[in-house]
Amino acid sequence: MYIVYQMPRILSTLCQSSFKRLLTHHNFQLNNNMSSLSSVPLVDIDPSGVFKYILINVYEEVKSGQEPKITIVRGYKRCNYHSDIYDEVQAKLSPLDCEPLAGGRISHDPENKKIHIYGYSQGYGKADHEVTAKLIKAAYPEYTITISDEGY
């Protein structure tokens, strides 16, 4: 609470660019940076290890009334639940609308350039691993990508 209380005074002593560098250094995003689908990476997964992932549809409302969308993959070891991934991504991509589709697990082995996609999410159901594999293959073209419907 002390930090929140002191924030106006702290901000007044920092110039805006220094504050943005500080936020970026601590892995925070300013929401106004994510105002269009073109600025959203299709794949953001941890560089190694075994972790949960989800597929998410991201929508952008345009003046014509249509809602263009993209499907993205997100997976992080730091998230214990698939819903934690969704909550983090939704906050980061605001004001874009997000819709969780389903989830699973990823085993990422960078030494051998292999990614294995498998399992399901108890909360969101089993993701279409073919869609996930296609997105990941585009981001990691030199990797061998495998999928399985086995395991949790």
Give, region by region, the residue ranges found by the protein language model.
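Intrinsic low-complexity, intrinsically disordered or marginally ordered coil/linker segments
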Residues: 2-152
